[in-house]
Amino acid sequence: MSTFFEPENGMKQNAKTERILDVALELLETEGEFGLTMRQVATQADMSLSNVQYYFKSEDLLLVAMADRYFQRCLTTMAEHPPLSAGRDQHAQLRALLRELLGHGLEISEMCRIFREYWAIATRNETVHGYLKSYYRDLAEVMAEKLAPLASSEKALAVAVSLVIPYVEGYSVTAIAMPESIDTISETLTNVVLEQLRISNS
């Protein structure tokens, strides 16, 4: 898994960088992208602007470091999930995983707000766009590792991953307005994905 952020000046993250990131993330969550400026971060962190810029030379570098705080946590959580087993109860295993992923987006509201801000920023910022592209590639690789034992072929696996990730991401945004429960959707998505994983492409 890749990470874009390395602290400036060869320094490891310390209390000051953590404070800057805490303040910046709070500003992004409460004020949105347009309320997040280096000067505002410095003010809220009780630091000088030059001190903030010592650790983060530009707003783009700060945005990427902030993204690492959240997005890498998601990758780590997913990577720690054991792969599914090709043995019995494949449906139950897959359903449990998908239910967990769908529920995660609903329960961690702060994280979801940060994600949504980054999706919006990426439409205007090439650095953030590149970061998200790398993140989703990494996420696809991790997801493929988890689903691979159930897949009949590489093609079937690739299609399944391409179904799961966009659906889960979109569900976190739209679920509150959907007419069906998360349990119903988990079951339906499990059926669709499992059928795809079992498709023979020979």
From Swiss-Prot:
PROSITE patterns the record matches: HTH_TETR_2
Species the sequence originates in: Xanthobacter autotrophicus
Domain HTH tetR-type: 14-74
GO MF entries: DNA-binding transcription factor activity; transcription cis-regulatory region binding
Keywords: DNA-binding, Transcription, Transcription regulation
InterPro entries: Homeodomain-like_sf, HTH-type_TetR-like_transc_reg, HTH_TetR, Tet_transcr_reg_TetR-rel_C_sf
Name of the protein this chain belongs to: Uncharacterized HTH-type transcriptional regulator in dhlA 5'region
The keyword Transcription is annotated on this UniProt entry: yes
